[in-house]
Amino acid sequence: MGRLFGTDGVRGVANADLTAELALGLSVAAAHVLAEAGTFAGHRATAVVGRDPRASGEFLEAAVVAGLASAGVDVLRVGVLPTPAVAHLTGALGADLGVMLSASHNAMPDNGIKFFARGGHKLADELEDRIESVYADHRTGAPWDRPTGSGVGRVRDYDEGLDQYVAHLVGVLPNRLDGLKIVLDEAHGAASRVSPEAFARAGAELVTIGAVPDGLNINDGCGSTHLDLLKAAVVEHGADLGIAHDGDADRCLAVDHTGAEVDGDQILAVLALAMREREALRSDTVVATVMSNLGFKLAMEREGIRFVQTGVGDRYVLEEMKEHGYALGGEQSGHVIILDHATTGDGTLTGLMLAARVAQTGRTLRDLASVMERLPQVLVNVPDVDKSRVTSSAELATAVAEAERELGSTGRVLLRPSGTEPLVRVMVEAADIEQARSVAGRLADSVKSALG
């Protein structure tokens, strides 16, 4: 059995890779591992379980709930809610464990399981490894320790979760959104009820699209991975801005009043300046990944804000933030973490904070986002090469050094081995697109020559 946990939980095609048996087994294993770690010591354990609206979530939820209850864990079933809502409720309700069933921005046939520890933070890698180990042992014959009688877990629906989460979101806003007209695209996903309710309570006039989930249409031509519908709707309705989420609403992208995209880097830049103005940007520092556009780094330096870089993945951003006490971080893809108010990327919170900045300043989102200029970026995938030698090849190091000399301070090069495929990703940013394409093409040839 290969490693089940990826960078964002366990994912796969529902009922093929991710079966009811696997969901049940992992849930029992998680309960045993947390009990073993002392998480449940001295009290009866409780878990919060939520899901996005994809059809497979119904049977997977049943499997997870059965697994937890059979291991003696009481379950609060919160139904269809965003991933950050499950994380928030895990902390707010004092639960020992949170479980979210979602494959985020993936297509409908996929699904996933993500576990949260007490307080609403993602499980540490070592706990995920231990869960896999306990689950594997059981598959090869090791028996579960099963409670009986009053020791089994009890299950109840917790219908107050949505209202509790929305109240939290609106309660942390620095100002209201009165006077703003906003288009929301909910990707027919987990925020289809939450996000419109939160924006309406905050005072915005709303046009909502992609908010009629039927279990099959999640992320289908809408949401943060397909912005064309949102762009058209913003222009058609004369809105001030548009906000798009993905299937589990842990990310947010935006559209300005002209229909132009505002990506995660630009959102981070706008929020960084707003938070510094409120003295909420601790250490005047923002955290982002190596995939952030160089224009973001240059803009932050120009504004006197320190930029800390991590590996790709919001979990690495979060680790850096927690270790050093930073308040803001995120990714170009729209995962934005505002650590004073959320334990993970929260698309609805991000959208609300962005809209609040527009309302507070009276400036357009286009004007606010112009604080950074996105440099042209070219990404080339080079397949069928020995990706393990990316950092050790002298020939490749020479080619990269030559490219960096050519680009100077207004460009950069990043070579990144894929985590799942035998390929290397070549990313080049430059002052103009033609130079970026030229340098990327030459570097791709060098990768083939050196690693092929």
Curated annotation (Swiss-Prot):
Known catalytic reactions: alpha-D-glucosamine 1-phosphate = D-glucosamine 6-phosphate
Post-translational modification: Activated by phosphorylation.
InterPro entries registered for this protein in UniProt: A-D-PHexomutase_a/b/a-I, A-D-PHexomutase_a/b/a-I/II/III, A-D-PHexomutase_a/b/a-II, A-D-PHexomutase_a/b/a-III, A-D-PHexomutase_C, A-D-PHexomutase_C_sf, Alpha-D-phosphohexomutase_SF, GlmM_bact
Gene3D superfamilies, alphabetized: Alpha-D-Glucose-1,6-Bisphosphate, subunit A, domain 3 (3.40.120.10), Alpha-D-phosphohexomutase, C-terminal domain (3.30.310.50)
Root EC class: isomerase
Annotated Mg(2+) binding sites: S104, D246, D248, D250
Keyword line: Isomerase, Magnesium, Metal-binding, Phosphoprotein
Its EC number(s): 5.4.2.10
Cited Pfam families: PGM_PMM_I, PGM_PMM_II, PGM_PMM_III, PGM_PMM_IV
Cofactor note: Binds 1 Mg(2+) ion per subunit.
A GO term for molecular function: magnesium ion binding
Biological role: Catalyzes the conversion of glucosamine-6-phosphate to glucosamine-1-phosphate.
HAMAP family per the UniProt record, alphabetical: GlmM_B (MF_01554_B)
Protein name: Phosphoglucosamine mutase
Natural source organism: Streptomyces coelicolor (strain ATCC BAA-471 / A3(2) / M145)
Lineage, broadest ranks: Bacteria, Bacillati, Actinomycetota, Actinomycetes, Kitasatosporales
